A protein has these predicted regions:
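Conserved class I S-adenosyl-L-methionine
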Residues: 1-33, 35-44
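A short acidic, Gly/Pro-enriched loop at the edge of an enzyme's catalytic core
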Residues: 95-102
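Conserved SAM-binding motif I beta-strand of class I
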Residues: 58-63
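Conserved SAM/SAH-binding beta-strand->alpha-helix loop
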Residues: 65-67
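Core SAM-dependent methyltransferase catalytic element
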Residues: 172-193
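Conserved SAM-binding strand-loop segment of SAM-dependent methyltransferases
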Residues: 79-90
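Conserved beta-strand signature within the Rossmann-like core of class I S-adenosyl-L-methionine
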Residues: 125-132
Length: 193
């Protein structure tokens, strides 16, 4: 077991880590297809994966934590939702080309995955990406710069995509707001690519 897996297993074993659907998804459900294949990257206990499945999508959900994946499988079974949940240490070579209609990435920043995410989306597919920012004013989320977005970084990561919505709440200090200290991008992969 890796140190990362052990860390997240301990966190998820203590109980619910985040039981709310991510703001990016709750604010933009109108853009989510009611069919097709989606991927929830670093899904944790699967709140977002379950929400996508409830909207009618087929869902692949990946996370390094065996505890979180087991909790997700139990919740999916109880709710009678189909979620293909897998314990994985996510690497770029895992992403099949032109496979997904939607890829959701919340609170997990691994810049080495950007090209893989881009390639894994079908033309016209949607990326929904939300995570913490480096210039956040609130003491929330990770502190290491490797795990924090720089200003406008999301826009540059998916610069060839058509932006549907972008929000930067770095200056937001309301810890009750699900976007406090975060930024998000909803963008569509151009057709014909």
């Amino acid at each position: 077991m890796s140190d990362s897996q052990d860390k997240w297993d301990r966190i998820y074993a203590r109980g619910s880590h985040n039981a709310k659907v991510a703001a990016i998804l709750s604010r933009h459900t109108d853009l989510v297809q009611t069919s097709g294949l989606s991927l929830d990257i670093a899904c944790g206990q699967g709140t977002n994966a379950l929400a996508l499945a409830a909207l009618g999508m087929e869902v692949d959900a990946w996370d390094i934590s065996a505890v979180a994946i087991e909790q997700l499988k139990d919740a999916a079974h109880r709710q009678r939702l189909a979620v293909n949940a897998r314990i994985v240490d996510i690497t770029p070579d895992m992403f099949p080309d032109n496979h997904y209609d939607l890829i959701l990435n919340c609170h997990y920043l691994d810049r080495s995955l950007t090209t893989a995410i881009t390639s894994a989306l079908k033309p016209g597919g949607l990326v929904m990406f939300q995570t913490f920012t480096a210039n956040k004013l609130a003491d929330i989320g990770p502190s290491h710069q490797d795990y924090l977005l720089q200003p406008d970084e999301l826009l540059s990561m998916f610069k060839d995509f058509e932006t549907e919505s972008y929000c930067d709440e770095s200056q937001n200090v309301d810890r009750n707001d699900p976007l406090c200290g975060r930024a998000y991008l909803v963008a569509r992969k151009p057709t014909g690519t």
